[in-house]
Amino acid sequence: MEYRSLTLDDFLSRFQLLRPQINREPLNHRQAAVLIPIVRRPQPGLLLTQRSIHLRKHAGQVAFPGGAVDDTDASVIAAALREAEEEVAIPPSAVEVIGVLPPVDSVTGYQVTPVVGIIPPDLPYRASEDEVSAVFEMPLAQALHLGRYHPLDIYRRGDSHRVWLSWYEQYFVWGMTAGIIRELALQIGVTP
């Protein structure tokens, strides 16, 4: 697939035709969710945030809006929508949820479910000052280009795991966020 010419219709049909493969037991049982907000445009965008430098965990990192599932959430989808509203003022009613990707185990002990949703192009994003220092949009075709991600094998507590690294403008995209974007690319049939 030529990544430079990805339209929203191309993305939607490929996402809905190719179902994700879940092929292992989760390591973590605490639940969290992130919203992968796809901005509805002729050439769609991918909305990302940069976390506040004042946070205890993952300070300053590029991330999707999201967080832990709490007792008030009816589902992981509800948690992703709640967190997106809290972090960047995306109303849940403005998100057209189209599906989920397989859960990812985080190094902080959560099983994170990526929820894919389409959002309107004219939403007035408002970053939560406590959690988010920046909100930015990356062209989806660029985000899904697998050649932009570089592997790094990390050894922690005797185990090895691979993380992915990339840049977009001044933003360093890596770790779970880069891994989720790569999984989304693979889900829609982008070949390495």
UniProtKB/Swiss-Prot annotation:
Q: Does the keyword Metal-binding belong to this entry?
A: yes
Keyword Manganese: yes or no?
yes
The cofactor required is:
Mn(2+); Mg(2+)
Q: Which GO terms describe its biological process?
A: nucleoside diphosphate metabolic process
Q: In which residues is Mg(2+) bound?
A: E83, E87
Q: Name one GO molecular function term.
A: coenzyme A diphosphatase activity
Family according to the record: Belongs to the Nudix hydrolase family. PCD1 subfamily.
Q: What does this protein do?
A: Probably mediates the hydrolysis of some nucleoside diphosphate derivatives.
Q: Which PANTHER family match?
A: MITOCHONDRIAL COENZYME A DIPHOSPHATASE NUDT8, NUDIX HYDROLASE
Give the protein name, as stated in the record. Answer: Uncharacterized Nudix hydrolase NudL
